[in-house]
C-alpha cells in the first residue's frame, strides 16, 4: 500500500491533536484554568471513590499526560486505542450525571477519531512511502 500526502496529513493531524489535547487537559487537572473538572464527575462516582474528587482528577490528569506524550512520541497505535477507551469511559461518566450530554456526544465522536488514528497508524506501519516520485519502504 502506498501512503499519499493526504493520508500522511490526516495521520499527523490526528497524532498532534490526540497528543496535545490529552496533554493540555491532563496538565489542567492540576490548575483548573480551563474548567473546574470535578463538576463533570458523576455523583455516583464521587460517592464510590475512596479518594477525594480533587485527588481523583489529579490521577486522571497523570493518565491523560501519559496518553498524550505516548501518542506524540511513538506509541501512537496502542495509545490511540487507549485514548478511544478512555474517552468512551468519560462519556459514560458524563451520561451518568444526567447532564452534559453534549460533551458526552463529543467524547464519543473523539473516541471514534482516536480509533481512526490507531487504524491509520497500523496502516502506515506496513506501507511504502512515495516522495518526489520515489518509493520508500518503512523499515520493519
Regions found by a protein language model. Give the residues of each.
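Perimembrane loop-to-helix junctions flanking transmembrane segments
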Residues: 38-52
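Extended, low-polarity transmembrane helix blocks
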Residues: 1-35, 50-62, 66, 72-140
